[in-house]
Amino acid sequence: MKNNRILALSGNDIFSGGGLAADLATYTLNGLHGFVAMTCLTALTENGFEVFPTDETIFQQQLDSLKSVDFGGIKIGLLPTVGVAEKALNFIKERTGVPVVLDPVLVCKETHDVAVSELCQELIRFFPYVTVITPNLPEAELLAGQKIETLDDMKDAAQKLHDLGAPAVIIKGGNRLSQDKAVDVFYDGENFTIFENPVIQGQNAGAGCTFASSIASQLVKGEELLPAIESSKAFVYRAIAQADQYGVRQYEANQN
């Protein structure tokens, strides 16, 4: 490993189960030097769990501060607005050859308002510039523009997202297709790989962030994509098994 510096473009989860806390914990456990450009803050208010986007000028200043840093990999998480996303996209366009993992987090993903639609279109613009995308089932439905109710639907959506420009796709199905097992579908443009694990009951906040940052970490360390996904699946499974009320536990997962 020639370069152990890895960047997260992600938000701050106030409870530290996900977001930049999960990213940095995962980077540290992999022996990497983690950097963060913060995309948003979060807080639990009388209105529920709220997201407060980073001012676009400040976000750009963060990225400008990192221009001279040579990164071995980048993980992209919550991009709360089109404006923030555009600045992130311009940043990775200048990093050709660097592995990039895009976790296309869609806030309020159960709604289909104009803001979500615009953000979907902006995230699709990232696809040709990343290594792999890691949507969950609702995010894959929004990005692919289709309902997913069966394993074949997951495969169709993965192919559609690949056709939109993503070199590789892993759709995290969770337990929506089956009550007793979690099903994920990986597609690299040629072959499908199906992952199945028993469902763990409990808090899984931060699992998606941890999964994406673990994949990015393995790629920085020189692993090929499919083995990176396989080892990251195992790591996240252990992290969910050790979760508390605030989310998955990366450090405890690494001890098992």
Predicted regions and their residues:
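Conserved phosphate/ATP/ADP-binding segment of small-molecule kinases
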Residues: 116-191
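Short pre-catalytic strand/loop immediately N-terminal to key active-site residues, enriched for Gly-Thr
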Residues: 10-15, 192-205
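Short glycine/serine/threonine-rich phosphate/pyrophosphate-binding segments
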Residues: 15-24, 209-212
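Short, small-residue alpha-helix embedded
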Residues: 141-142, 201-225
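Phosphate-handling active-site elements
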Residues: 31-35, 192-193, 218-231
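Conserved N-terminal subdomain of the carbohydrate kinase-like
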Residues: 2-8, 20-109
